[in-house]
Design a protein with these regions (language model features):
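Phosphate-binding and adjacent anionic-ligand microenvironments
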Residues: 1-105, 113-115, 122-153
Length: 153
């Protein structure tokens, strides 16, 4: 598939990276980051479980300065999760602008995992590397804010 794409780009006189940049400008630039909050031993497992329960009881209104527009608790809510996904210890925050944050305990280690996906609009002439760096910085700030909200930092 990639070879076909590269050949199409070559025939059109554009580079593959230019084609990718065009897709970013049309659909937005997405970045993803994650943060793992490790708490050792049985006490750590209990602390993580308590943090997840507290999160379900008291949801943040903003994360990293971005408004949380909605939440999905995959432990419940069978009507909103994919059919193939059973009940999970997973909470998803829907962010203003189309981003999301996921929080879940690890299934194998005493750690809580936070995943952040953000999208930013890119205009013609924008430096893609700089735009990606700004989005990643914002994603890290969102993950750090959720960690603080949970009392982990």
């Amino acid at each position: 598939w990639f070879a076909d794409l590269a050949m199409d780009c070559h025939r059109s006189g554009i580079g593959v990276l230019d084609r990718l940049a065009g897709l970013y400008r049309r659909h937005g630039l997405w970045v993803s980051t994650q943060k793992a909050l490790v708490r050792p031993g049985d006490e750590g497992l209990a602390e993580i479980a308590a943090a997840m329960e507290a999160l379900r009881d008291s949801l943040p209104a903003t994360l990293g300065g971005v408004v949380v527009e909605g939440t999905t608790d995959y432990r419940d809510g069978a009507e909103v999760r994919p059919r193939w996904l059973g009940a999970q210890a997973l909470v998803e925050f829907h962010l203003e602008g189309g981003g999301r944050v996921l929080a879940r305990p690890s299934g194998t280690e005493p750690k809580l995992k936070i995943y952040v996906d953000l999208m930013g609009a890119i205009d013609v002439g924008d430096d893609l590397d700089a735009a990606e760096a700004v989005l990643l910085e914002q994603a890290d700030a969102i993950a750090d804010d959720l960690a603080r909200f949970l009392g982990f930092e």
